[in-house]
Amino acid sequence: MKSLVSCAWLVTIVALPFSQSALARDAQYDVLVATHAKANNLPEALVHRVIVRESGYRPSLVSHGNIGLMQIKFGTARGLGYTGTAEGLRDPETNLTWAVKYLAGAWRAASGDHKRAMHYYASGYYHAAKRQRHPAPPRLEELTSANAQQVAK
């Protein structure tokens, strides 16, 4: 029993710096996440969950062709209208702009279910959206055009 308590104490001491570090990174991106979540009608908690799962708040992470905070693929971002370089997706603002837009499509295809939305984000939601006849997320040009029309009114 004494060794079990000692082991638990050791695990707590070792894990504490990592959890505090993760919380510090979380706070660093709170405003950015809130802005993009609101713009795409998503719960902030869902965006944070994806970031934690995909990169642990490491914006420079590249793994198997997935890039940045939300580990979006360059081809996926290009399909949504991104015209920059793959390297540009390491920028947190750029990464969230395109990855949260993609997550919004997964969220709609999942009918608002967090767990399913995360699954669709990681594995693709094309077929689920097609079955449900959800429209594709708007491209940047469409968003810019719609905003310009609202401003003109």
Task: Give the ranges of each region predicted by the language model.
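Proline-rich, low-complexity linker regions of envelope-associated factors in Gram-negative bacteria
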Residues: 20-29, 141-153
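Bacterial N-terminal signal peptides
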Residues: 7-17
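Export/targeting segments at the very N-terminus of extracytoplasmic proteins
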Residues: 18-56
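Positively charged n-region of N-terminal signal peptides that target proteins for export
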Residues: 1-6
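Catalytic and binding regions of secreted/periplasmic enzymes and modules that target cell-wall glycans
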Residues: 100-139
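Solvent-exposed loop/turn segments at secondary-structure junctions
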Residues: 55-58, 76-79, 124-127
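A short, structured beta-strand-centered segment in the mid-to-C-terminal lobe
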Residues: 87-94
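Substrate-binding/active-site groove segments that recognize
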Residues: 65-82
